Amino acid sequence: VPSHLKELLKDLCTTSPVLGAAIFTVEGLPFVSYFNTGTEDVTVAAMVASLHSTSVQMLHELRQGSLKSIIVEGTGGKTVIVSVPPGYVLAVVAPDIARTGLVFGDAKRVARECTRLIEQVG
């Protein structure tokens, strides 16, 4: 499964305006990653896990259901985080010039495919 997931991430990075993508456990452990830059996936995994945990807690406190996605936009780029049940998240890093809707749509599509592949094994 990891090789199929890596291919999915590689395809996303070559067909979409993204700098890299990775699948992490919700605990913050790297699972599969594909970054075009020298990005340290262990560092990104820890930050994504922190954001995920905080967001899950917020949704619980506000009684807004389960977490589906997070979009973080900065002046130099954006990161889209999408839940990949069971127990994983997909993080997609894109430059500022990338259209948020396009990146988000591609991330959701890849997350669905990742979920399907992971569920086949487990």
Language-model-derived ranges and their functions:
Residues 1-20, 27-122:
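Acidic, low-complexity cytosolic segments
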